[in-house]
Amino acid sequence: MIDEKRIAIKCVTGSHATGLNDDKSDIDRKIVFYPTIDELFSGRHANKQTIMPEEDTEYVDIRSFMKSLQDTTINGLEILFGHDINVVDENISPILTNKNNIAKCNLPKLFLSTSGMAYNQYKSFTSLKRPNNAKSVLFFDRHSQDTKSLMTIVRLCKTLELFAESEFTDFQSSFCFKDDEIGKRYMLNVKNNVGNLTFEENVEFAKIYMARIDVLKDEYMKHSIDLDTNGFVSEVIHNATLINMIKNK
């Protein structure tokens, strides 16, 4: 258990953050915490995860969080754009205030990491192997295919598409479908295979989305890294970590 004094941010992530939750969805939480002095100087990151029947909690070392923001990965951004965000330490609040700049500070890496996640989900889906993930098993057993992974492919591809369409100004609406009833219904229909599509039909469906993000690659890759924003992230997190360490030594 992480000492409350070492916690920087708490938030709800996963389907509740993207607006794609239903009455069967459990709650995913992420807690960003500061390292102890020993962890800091040993270089050891103490990330860990606890899984309960209705709630999963991931503890994220703030140094890992910093790297995920500088690389502009979905895993980092979902904390900034999550649901029910609680900034426990105000020294970290400038990060949240500047989240829109952070979301576009490394667009090439955002594209590569997100499209890579989509491709891994595609490989998992097309393998037709029963997934290890307990959340996906329910859908595999019901439909004889991992339709939860299929929805994730569509969601990741749509996020890249919508963010580019907004000219990289509105990650919130690109990432979260809470206020988009049509988009939300579409995603949940994919997950629940409302159209009763065969596996082969869903593979072709996934290929369409994978092809659509291939077209976006140049649009993302032509942007350079925003070193000023990267430096800002580093400065805020390093200072907040130092202050926390002094207060709680």
Task: Give the positions of each predicted feature.
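Helical scaffold of the NTase/Pol beta-like nucleotidyltransferase catalytic core
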Residues: 1-16
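Extracellular structured ligand-interaction cores
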Residues: 28, 66, 148-150
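Catalytic metal-binding acidic patch
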Residues: 18-52, 153
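Phosphate/oxyanion-binding loops and surfaces in catalytic or ligand/nucleic-acid-binding neighborhoods
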Residues: 36, 72, 163
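Conserved nucleotidyltransferase catalytic core and NTase-mimicking acidic/glycine-rich helix/loop elements
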Residues: 93-238, 247
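A basic- and aromatic-enriched beta-loop-alpha substructure that forms the phosphate/nucleotide-
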Residues: 41-131
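Non-catalytic regulatory/linker segments of enzymes
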Residues: 5-8, 22-24, 232-240, 247
